[in-house]
């Protein structure tokens, strides 16, 4: 398995990154639904876990490129709550792979000023995986570069439900006035409270859905659907998605004329 942050300096890649930085504003937060490992493996005549192993190289390249670009937040949809319904041998192999990758790359994350975070229902995560996650999070918690968040045992419906449950409990205990509940307060109870909403959401493998990922947070995200299967996704596809993002006009419910007026003011 290749190590992270060992790519040789490429003048052309550096030029592309500098062009992206100077062309227009970069997304502060990129979310990626990494899909297509199983189909990639089937096409290659390999096992599904071989597809997941191949996908690790894509993670490495995208994390490295995002960090080099100065992206503040990168969230990778790694494993959904619904994925617990998959065959147990596949789940076990995935969890072992996650532990192996975290242990192998933790020091690289530390050295490259990347902070690891995780969102999801941790009660469903096996103890050995939680222990490895906790160790890596603690190791990198003082880093101030890019925040790389793993969405593990996560679903948008779960996130909204757990926020509602916590708010309802505080109202019941008399600690929260229902009249003070607004969008900002609600968002502060989501698992993503410490990060901005995604500006750009990328979904690989040619599927056109967001698969229960950050349902609240993606309200105004620009969504790019890539036909590339995740194990074949590399920084060039990431750059192309960012170029497309930079071409789009983000109106947030306003008209183009209103945005132009605000720019003049």
UniProtKB/Swiss-Prot annotation:
Cofactor note: Binds 2 magnesium ions per subunit.
Binding site for Mg(2+): 35, 222
Binding site for substrate: 36-40, 48, 52, 80-82, 84, 86, 203, 209-211
Lineage, highest ranks first: Bacteria, Pseudomonadati, Chlorobiota, Chlorobiia, Chlorobiales
Active site feature: 35, 83
Protein name: Isoprenyl transferase
Superkingdom in the source lineage: Bacteria
Cofactors, names only: Mg(2+)
Function according to Swiss-Prot or TrEMBL: Catalyzes the condensation of isopentenyl diphosphate (IPP) with allylic pyrophosphates generating different type of terpenoids.
PANTHER family: DEHYDRODOLICHYL DIPHOSPHATE SYNTHASE 2, DEHYDRODOLICHYL DIPHOSPHATE SYNTHASE FAMILY MEMBER
GO molecular function: ditrans,polycis-polyprenyl diphosphate synthase [(2E,6E)-farnesyl diphosphate specific] activity; magnesium ion binding
HAMAP family: ISPT
EC number(s) stated in the UniProt entry for this protein: 2.5.1.-
